[in-house]
Amino acid sequence: MTQASPANLLKNALEHGELELKGQFLLGSNYTFLVKVRHEGQEIPAIYKPARGEQPLWDFPEASLAGREVAAYLVSEALGFNFVPLTVLRADGPFGSGSLQQSIEYDPNYHYFTFSESDRERLRPVALFDLLVNNADRKGSHLLIEKGTNKLWLIDHGLCFHAEDKLRTVLWDFAGEALPDELLATLRTLRSILAHSRSAPHAPISTTLPSYLQPEELASLAARADCLLANPVFPHPPEDRRAYPYPPL
């Protein structure tokens, strides 16, 4: 009998495991909880964000942020970046439906503003990802380096995928640079997926994203990819609106 991969075991645990509340994160405007997931002998720490704990926003639909967290994970996987921790939607959370995300162990004092030059150089795919998902809140503390592995992770994607241009990020380091060839190839792959190409890897994302995003948001995602393919350059910060999140950390 074929053994399930660690990734599949983790996904199965997050989707079906028993959730025990362990604590609440008090920073941030939305309710966020640390939970312990128990499943088939595993005990896994995870981050639970219930939709009912989301503060109302004038520019995002009510109770939609949890689904956007899942959509960001799906797009990261489709791009092959794999830097959003595994994220699922749980309808049966302790406080109702919400996102459930693999917890990452990291040093909170090591983030974008304290990264080494070599770690900063790793961030071009992040800049592209944020352009595509239209991240309205890329703070410096949302970029993590995992302890023990030095793997780059990204968190907090509830304010993504708006149909209008909302990009607010601390990461403008590469403004004016041409997109590297490998990122262009990745971008073409994503565009094929969004066009429902049967030959594209991860094609099922084209059928799962509509569960979390509005039709106009999906259309805007495809349009942003098209714009970057037509003009493959990292943009400069806009001058006609706010380009940086507040607070930046």
Model-predicted segments: where are they?
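Catalytic domains of riboflavin
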Residues: 3-4
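C-terminal catalytic region of ATP-dependent kinase domains
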Residues: 24, 61, 146-249
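Conserved ATP-binding subdomain of kinase catalytic cores across diverse folds
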Residues: 8-136, 140, 147-157, 169
